[in-house]
Curated annotation (Swiss-Prot):
Belongs to the phosphoglycerate kinase family. InterPro entries: Phosphoglycerate_kinase, Phosphoglycerate_kinase_N, Phosphoglycerate_kinase_sf. PANTHER family: PHOSPHOGLYCERATE KINASE, PHOSPHOGLYCERATE KINASE 1, CHLOROPLASTIC-RELATED. ATP binds at K211, G299, E330, G359, G360, D361, S362. It is found in: Cytoplasm. Its EC number is 2.7.2.3. It catalyses: (2R)-3-phosphoglycerate + ATP = (2R)-3-phospho-glyceroyl phosphate + ADP. Monomer. Its main location: cytoplasm. This is Phosphoglycerate kinase. GO terms for molecular function: ADP binding; ATP binding; phosphoglycerate kinase activity. It comes from Rhodococcus jostii (strain RHA1).
Amino acid sequence: MAVQTLDDLLNAGVEGRAVLVRSDLNVPLDGDRITDPGRIIASAPTLKALAEAGAKVIVTAHLGRPKGEPDPQYSLAPVAVKLAEVLGRNVQLAGDVVGQDALARAEGLTDGDVLLLENIRFDPRETSKDEAERTKLAKALVELVGDDGAFVSDGFGVVHRAQASVYEVAKLLPHYAGKLVEAEIKVLGKLTEEPERPYAVVLGGSKVSDKLAVIEALAPKVDTLVIGGGMYYTFLAAQGVSVGNSLCEESMIDTCKALLEQYADVIHIPQDVVIADSFSADAESKIVSVLEIPDGWMGLDIGPQSVRRFAAILTSAKTVFWNGPMGVFEFEKFAAGTKGVAEAIIEATGKGAYSVVGGGDSAAAVRQLGLPEDGFSHISTGGGASLEYLEGKELPGIAVLEG
C-alpha cells in the first residue's frame, strides 16, 4: 500500500502532538445499550498506540444517520463509555463537534489524553455535496489539532465516502493509514490480486440492486458464487417460479435472468427454503422445495438441503469471501442457513482456506450466533467499503491517503 502508516507516524514521534483520528464507531444500539461493540474493539489498537506514545488523541466518528443537527438518540455518549472501557483509560466526550466545548477540551489535553468529539454527522457539512462546505468543516477539525497535528484515517467503514472527516481533512494535514485501514486493504488485496483457488464467494442480504455491481464484478473472476438471503427470490422469480410473498425486486428480474444464463456454471442458488406465513419470530414455518412456495407465504431462510450442498462447495474452497446472511438470522427459526454456511466457511478455514467476512450483517451474525470470530481469517468492519473495493471502484478515503 503506497501510503504512510501509523508506524511511520509513531516513528516520527507523536509525544506532545495532537493527532486527529477518524474512527468507525458506528455500532448498533438498543436504547443506549451497545448490542455489538465490534467496531469499537477494532478501532482500539490505533487509539491505544497513539495514547501510549504520548499523543493528544482527538477522535471523530459518526453514529447512525442524524439529519445534520444534534439528536440525542445519536449521541456518542454510550460509545465514549465503552471506548474508555476497551482502552482502559479515560475518554472525554465533547458536547459538540467543532464548537466551543470541543475547542476548550482540545486545548486542555495533556499527553496521552483521549477526546471523542460528538457525532460528526450532527454537522451538516460532513455529508454536504458542496466541497467548499466540507472543506470548512475540515478546517475546523484541523484547528483542533493545530499546526503540528496529524491525521490518521482508521474508519474503514467510511473510506468509500468523500466526506469532510474522511477526505477533505486528509488534504489539510500529514496523513496516515491507521492499523485497521492498513489491515483491511492488505486483506482485500489478497482477494483481488492472486486468490488461491478454488475461490468461492457467498452473497446474501435483501436486495439484488445492492449487490448487482459486485455480482457483475466477481462472477467472471471466481469459481463459485453462492446466492442466498432475500435477494435470492428475485433470481427464483427470474426462472418463472412463484415466490409467494417473498421479497422480490420486479425491476431486477430480467437482470437476474441474464446473470443466471451467462454464469450458469458459477452461480449456485438454493433448492429448498424455509418459509413462513408472516414476518415474525414466532411465525408458522416449514421447509419446502423452491418450486412449492404457496401464495401468502414468504421465504425467510435457505433450507437444510441447500446448506449441505453449499457446505460441500465451501469446505473444498481455498479462498472464501462472504457478505450477507442467508436468511433472517435475527429470528432463531430462520438462522440455521446462515449458521450452516458460516460453519462451513470455518471448516474450510481450519483446512487452510483464506476466509473473509465482509462486514455489516454478516459480522453481526457471527457474533449473534455465537460463532468463533477467530474461525475466520478476517472479519471486515466495512461492508459497503469492502464491496466497492471488490467492484474495482476507487475509494476516496484511500485514494486521498495515496496523494
